[in-house]
Amino acid sequence: MLAKGLPPRSVLVKGCQTFLSAPREGLGRLRVPTGEGAGISTRSPRPFNEIPSPGDNGWLNLYHFWRETGTHKVHLHHVQNFQKYGPIYREKLGNVESVYVIDPEDVALLFKSEGPNPERFLIPPWVAYHQYYQRPIGVLLKKSAAWKKDRVALNQEVMAPEATKNFLPLLDAVSRDFVSVLHRRIKKAGSGNYSGDISDDLFRFAFESITNVIFGERQGMLEEVVNPEAQRFIDAIYQMFHTSVPMLNLPPDLFRLFRTKTWKDHVAAWDVIFSKADIYTQNFYWELRQKGSVHHDYRGILYRLLGDSKMSFEDIKANVTEMLAGGVDTTSMTLQWHLYEMARNLKVQDMLRAEVLAARHQAQGDMATMLQLVPLLKASIKETLRLHPISVTLQRYLVNDLVLRDYMIPAKTLVQVAIYALGREPTFFFDPENFDPTRWLSKDKNITYFRNLGFGWGVRQCLGRRIAELEMTIFLINMLENFRVEIQHLSDVGTTFNLILMPEKPISFTFWPFNQEATQQ
């Protein structure tokens, strides 16, 4: 039978079960129909209000959401709703109404209709802070032509291949220093290995990496004694993400008017982020003015932006602030999840290591060449982001009316792609709970079509994508060459939503060095 309110297109390919007749798998696993091979309706599209929904009372919906799931489990809330309503549903939480989709065919229709200046959901407390305190904004919060102008200029220095090749030595140096940190700890432990939670170390690694790429300078975050001011910046980023969650579905002005601790902590976090980013940028600018601009070596993204007249200094500062704020927790979390999956899947880890060692030998140590010889390693990053995406959804406001699943979705509607639910859906991924990077190497496009969404899609995909991909790949190359990574407990650590998806509890790794001589140095 059909799920309530679902059009004929929602029937699975002949011989398969319908959406709701499928058994739940694991923690709320579900089976949804694919667009391919499904029946296509020839009738007029159904109206928007017929899309399956829990009801139009946003505040009542929000109450049930808080009581039954909670904001920190919103990713599981999506999974449960797709199980209940089918592959498309609409939900109003508070005063925000969205249409949610999961099928890659629908995702393709959505992104292919996004227009030249796509708009996504803007985090309400971020907007409130920037507006109330009159902070400059970059591409993260800009719209339309203003966004386009900044994005085009930034793409040339952040996304273009001729620019990103300059990042390799900067990122490799930081990764090698991280390896040295672990070797020092193994030596200090005196047990031939090191065990512990390295999440704070990964935050510092990510901060050291992004600042080296932006400023062309090291901040000393991997030294024995850590710069306390830089650590304040890292802590502020975490606090900014964490305090955003309670204000996603309630007006941030309420938190501000009642002077809640959540709002005060959120403001304090942003104040630190802006203050530190401004100091970094201003110091770099004045040093450049004093020493001149004659340099043969690459000096980082900021140097290139300042040498170009396409952006004002205020716009440059705003965008540098956003890149710094967005380049720490996001990358470090993905690396932590990747180490976690490698430690739980030692055969996969051995395959990745064999590929890296062969690439090192063939490339004779040249990192640029090595990066072309590790397709499985790159696929493993995609696989990590499938199981553990940073964002719980991707969002677009429709530019024009769009028909999805035979429903007419009006222009300006917020449509969200539930990428956590998509990544763990057995209809779209065979054996979805299994960490299998080889699935991304398939030549069958139907297996990967609009499924690799960890960095978003299109012209508004993650600005730092190329930096993050290089940073993570180079980090993993160095780690695989130097250590075998194991985990003390193989059970699932769980996932929690703190604006980004994070491990629910600390992960303790054990690192076994291959080169004992390096450990003794």
Curated annotation (Swiss-Prot):
The keyword Transcription regulation does not apply. It is a peripheral membrane protein. Gene3D superfamilies: Cytochrome P450. GO terms for biological process: C21-steroid hormone biosynthetic process; cellular response to peptide hormone stimulus; cholesterol metabolic process; cortisol metabolic process; glucocorticoid biosynthetic process; sterol metabolic process; vitamin D metabolic process. Its cofactor is heme. It comes from the Eukaryota. Induction: By 8-bromo cyclic AMP. Its EC number is 1.14.15.6. Pathway: Lipid metabolism; C21-steroid hormone metabolism; Steroid metabolism; cholesterol metabolism. Heme binds at residue 462. Its main location: mitochondrion. One of its GO terms (cellular component) is mitochondrion. It is found in: Mitochondrion inner membrane. It is linked to Adrenal insufficiency, congenital, with 46,XY sex reversal: A rare disorder that can present as acute adrenal insufficiency in infancy or childhood. ACTH and plasma renin activity are elevated and adrenal steroids are inappropriately low or absent; the 46,XY patients have female external genitalia, sometimes with clitoromegaly. The phenotypic spectrum ranges from prematurity, complete underandrogenization, and severe early-onset adrenal failure to term birth with clitoromegaly and later-onset adrenal failure. Belongs to the cytochrome P450 family. Interacts with FDX1/adrenodoxin. A cytochrome P450 monooxygenase that catalyzes the side-chain hydroxylation and cleavage of cholesterol to pregnenolone, the precursor of most steroid hormones. Catalyzes three sequential oxidation reactions of cholesterol, namely the hydroxylation at C22 followed with the hydroxylation at C20 to yield 20R,22R-hydroxycholesterol that is further cleaved between C20 and C22 to yield the C21-steroid pregnenolone and 4-methylpentanal. Mechanistically, uses molecular oxygen inserting one oxygen atom into a substrate and reducing the second into a water molecule. This is Cholesterol side-chain cleavage enzyme, mitochondrial. It comes from Homo sapiens (Human). The lineage of its organism: Eukaryota, Metazoa, Chordata, Craniata, Vertebrata.
